[in-house]
């Protein structure tokens, strides 16, 4: 007799855990500044997962890699290949840590939105979600990428780097300048839009048909989350390579 009420309560609990609220934020007041606490908390969790996993996997490195060490060596080799392909064989080395950090942080952040029950942690306002579910995170990552490719170009070419803005003709100066503004915009909004849309679709499906239909969508979300991390890292490496090679 009590099976139906129990099932309904269970489904309601699952829906609450899976929910995503948009537009509500929780802030810390530090001095005269408001700090976006939600993004900081979830970002710290992601960083802790990355550092903890790396520390456990390589705490006792072996000449013949074990499972954890072998996995991280494979990830490093993958990141090196991406960097080498986009930046160039002679220049890619110093940029592997930056590209790798971007890829791993975005990848784990995206997956945390699907796998970690952030809703369990209650906040006075808003709720926790994947760091990349917030436009502040994606804009910050895109601006870091912009700083990186400007730095790469200026380091390689000096002030001659700015000559690319008048190539192949000075008439294209406004378009070439605008291109540098659209790069971070496209990077940030592509990542933010895809991750937010993925989580909202899962929430809607859970509310309509709990337990069954959302599962394949969640697996698809994990796949697309990984692809988005790869796209962001690949484009960041491509922009850095382009800034050192010249205008294309």
Swiss-Prot record:
Localisation per UniProt entry: Plastid, Chloroplast thylakoid membrane
GO cellular component term, pick one: proton-transporting ATP synthase complex
A Gene Ontology molecular function term of the record: proton-transporting ATP synthase activity, rotational mechanism
Gene name, Swiss-Prot/TrEMBL: atpI
Protein name: ATP synthase subunit a, chloroplastic
Subunit record text: F-type ATPases have 2 components, CF(1) - the catalytic core - and CF(0) - the membrane proton channel. CF(1) has five subunits: alpha(3), beta(3), gamma(1), delta(1), epsilon(1). CF(0) has four main subunits: a, b, b' and c.
Coiled-coil ranges per UniProt: none
Segments traversing the membrane: 38-58, 96-116, 135-155, 200-220, 221-241
Lineage, broadest ranks: Eukaryota, Viridiplantae, Streptophyta, Embryophyta, Tracheophyta
Superkingdom, taxonomy of origin: Eukaryota
Keyword check for Thylakoid: yes
Function: Key component of the proton channel; it plays a direct role in the translocation of protons across the membrane.
Keywords (A to Z) from UniProt: ATP synthesis, CF(0), Chloroplast, Hydrogen ion transport, Ion transport, Membrane, Plastid, Thylakoid, Transmembrane, Transmembrane helix, Transport
Similarity comment text for this entry: Belongs to the ATPase A chain family.
Source organism: Nuphar advena (Common spatterdock)
Membrane-related topology note: Multi-pass membrane protein
Main location: plastid
InterPro entries reported in the protein's UniProt record: ATP_syn_F0_a_bact/chloroplast (IPR045082), ATP_synth_F0_asu (IPR000568), ATP_synth_F0_asu_AS (IPR023011), F0_ATP_A_sf (IPR035908)
């Amino acid at each position: 007799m009590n099976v139906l009420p129990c099932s309904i309560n269970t489904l309601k609990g699952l829906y609450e855990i899976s929910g995503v609220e948009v537009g509500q934020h929780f802030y810390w007041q530090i001095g005269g500044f408001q700090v976006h606490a939600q993004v900081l908390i979830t970002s710290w969790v992601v960083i802790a997962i990355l550092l903890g996993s790396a520390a456990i996997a390589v705490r006792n490195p072996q000449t013949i890699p074990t499972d954890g060490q072998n996995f991280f060596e494979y990830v490093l080799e993958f990141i090196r290949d991406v960097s080498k392909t986009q930046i160039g064989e002679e220049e890619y080395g110093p940029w592997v840590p930056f590209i790798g950090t971007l890829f791993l942080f975005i990848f784990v952040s995206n997956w945390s939105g699907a796998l970690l029950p952030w809703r369990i942690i209650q906040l006075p306002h808003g709720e926790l979600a994947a760091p990349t579910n917030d436009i502040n995170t994606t804009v910050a990552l895109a601006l870091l990428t912009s700083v990186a490719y400007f730095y790469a170009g200026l380091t390689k070419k000096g002030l001659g780097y700015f000559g690319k803005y008048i190539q192949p003709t000075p008439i294209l100066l406004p378009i070439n300048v605008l291109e540098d503004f659209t790069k971070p915009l496209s990077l940030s909004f592509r990542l933010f839009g895809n991750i937010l849309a993925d989580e909202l679709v899962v929430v809607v499906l859970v509310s309509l048909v709990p337990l069954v239909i959302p599962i394949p969508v969640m697996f698809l979300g994990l796949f697309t989350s990984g692809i988005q991390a790869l796209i962001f890292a690949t484009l960041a490496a491509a922009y850095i390579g382009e800034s050192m090679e010249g205008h294309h």
